[in-house]
């Protein structure tokens, strides 16, 4: 998938570096990283991870996704929540403010927003320092 905007490689943008444990949840069939994560380990289920990327398509999916995935990145990992980009013509009741508000209510804070590709934007969430 082509990177938009910054020119930063997609994996680096997401924090998936050699040695990282990562997981992708809910991606569309055929969605993939623009390059293969070298020397990083994909983990599944509820296994702890350094980076979890969750694709959500509607606001109703957001809270369950946060509840299911937030502990996987505790205390120092990153939970990326991706939603369909309205700029690409997608219709969705999600956006950065909806994701941010839901995250703050769960003791998570947003630290970065990124365009993953033409179809998806994402917000990077981490645990607030006082809750680590």
Segments from the language model and where they lie:
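Short acidic low-complexity segments
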Residues: 39-49
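Short, charged/polar "capping" segments at the starts of alpha-helices
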Residues: 28-35, 89-91
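Short, glycine-rich nucleotide/cofactor-binding loops
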Residues: 53-62
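Mid-chain, well-packed structural core segment of small domains
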Residues: 63-94
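Conserved class I S-adenosyl-L-methionine
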Residues: 13-27
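Conserved Class I S-adenosyl-L-methionine
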Residues: 93-114
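Flexible, polar/low-complexity N-terminal or interdomain linker segments that lie immediately upstream
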Residues: 1-16
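Class I S-adenosyl-L-methionine
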Residues: 107-132
């Amino acid at each position: 998938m082509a990177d938009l905007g910054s020119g930063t490689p997609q994996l680096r943008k997401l924090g998936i570096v050699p040695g990282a444990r990562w997981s992708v949840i809910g991606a569309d069939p055929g969605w993939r990283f623009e390059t293969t994560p070298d020397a990083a380990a994909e983990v599944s289920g509820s296994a702890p991870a350094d980076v979890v990327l969750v694709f959500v398509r509607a606001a109703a999916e957001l809270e369950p996704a946060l509840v299911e995935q937030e502990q996987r990145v505790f205390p120092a990992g990153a939970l990326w929540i991706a939603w369909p980009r309205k700029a690409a013509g997608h219709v969705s009741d999600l956006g950065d403010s909806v994701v941010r508000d839901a995250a703050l209510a769960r003791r998570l804070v947003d630290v970065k927003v990124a365009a993953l590709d033409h179809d998806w934007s994402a917000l990077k969430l981490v645990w607030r320092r006082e809750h680590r």
